[in-house]
Amino acid sequence: MASSTFFSDWNQMLKPRVTSLVLATIIPGLYLASEQSPSGFLIAITLFGTFLMSSASFIFNQVIEKDRDAKMKRTSNRPIPSGRISVVQATLVGIAMMGSSFYVLAVYVNLLTALCAFAALISYVFLYTIFLKPRTTQNIVIGGVAGCVGPLIGYAAIGNSLPVQAWSLFMMIFLWTPAHFWALAIFLKEEYSDADFPMLPVVKGIHQTTKSIFFYTILYSIACVSFYFLESSMGFLYLIVSLIVCIWMGILSYQLIQNPEPQSARKFFFFSILHLFIINITIVVDHLI
């Protein structure tokens, strides 16, 4: 039982399911930046190093937000607010993972890759968690930069540079992030209110939030389709798939305006995750064929 609790607690601290989406956004850059398929070792070490840095970010986030987490039903049983893991323990593990990540990426990949991953951590912990999230409804718009670094890491790992295609994928995720998290904030509105987080549904109301979700969904869809014209290796497979899933996401966002209920927001939230996975997988498949 003790070992089961240990693994469950650290699973909550490290958030591997969330990190898997970050890792998925690295893979297109690894393939697009290389004339030949990257080596298995380079792929593995880049993903492993990024996993460590992402996990460290989530640990520091939970250390900082422990008091607010205790006020939210969804987070009150997390290891730190419930007392199963101490702040000191979590901080030391976070520092160790952060340092290990930087070393692994700098030594076995290159310094630019390590700096990109570290910049994501700094952005998430300081810009988003400490400064923006408790202060503004636009917290996720600006603070979402941290979750967009995957493509930069992928391109940097192969070419030791950040070409325009890397930044276009960065911008794609940047535009995806607000709609995704505002949908989450709709069906967790009361909990965010209890924890005093000024999320958009709490401050501006659900109707305004659904209109903002629709607006960012359109911008994100334009960015997805535009990548076909920016990346010469993209073929009709990517164009067709991106058009189909973007149209469907647009329909869901419009339905959310018409029916702004938590269940509709939840449906949009989970589809947005699937959408980003599909886009990234299609980029790689189209490039390889």
From Swiss-Prot:
Converts heme B (protoheme IX) to heme O by substitution of the vinyl group on carbon 2 of heme B porphyrin ring with a hydroxyethyl farnesyl side group. HAMAP family: CyoE_CtaB. This is Protoheme IX farnesyltransferase. Its EC number is 2.5.1.141. Keywords: Cell inner membrane, Cell membrane, Heme biosynthesis, Membrane, Transferase, Transmembrane, Transmembrane helix. Signal peptide: none annotated. GO terms for biological process: heme biosynthetic process; heme O biosynthetic process. Its main location: membrane. It is found in: Cell inner membrane. Pathway: Porphyrin-containing compound metabolism; heme O biosynthesis; heme O from protoheme: step 1/1. GO terms for cellular component: plasma membrane. Carbon 2 of the heme B porphyrin ring is defined according to the Fischer nomenclature.
